[in-house]
Amino acid sequence: MVAFEGAARLGFRYVETDVHATADGVLLAFHDPHLDRLTDQHGRIDRLEWSSLRHVRVAGTEPIARLEELLGEFPDLRVNIEPKSDVAVELLINTIRRTGAEMRVCVGSFSDRRLHRFRAV
């Protein structure tokens, strides 16, 4: 969240994030599918539940942001989001609707299948 806070504080109105789904269906605003490179833990996000990820720290200090938290904390930010799995697409649609963020989220993907799936809903 600290990166998004910094962007907002500097006056940026648009941010970008990838989202990965945890094993129990929580969307995380995180670039990598694995924890190994950026955190103090190891493993794949999609194989772990949020209860075990909530204590993981990015660069040893910052928690991984939940997408719902990001959308709620920064209602004035426009967010470009890439769902990184098919599972994340359905969860993303539900999260956007639940947070009322339809008019400030742009969804993009290098996967045509994911984009078609998103557009179909």
Question: Where do the language-model regions lie?
Answer:
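Phosphate-group recognition and catalysis centered on beta-loop-alpha active-site segments
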Residues: 1-121
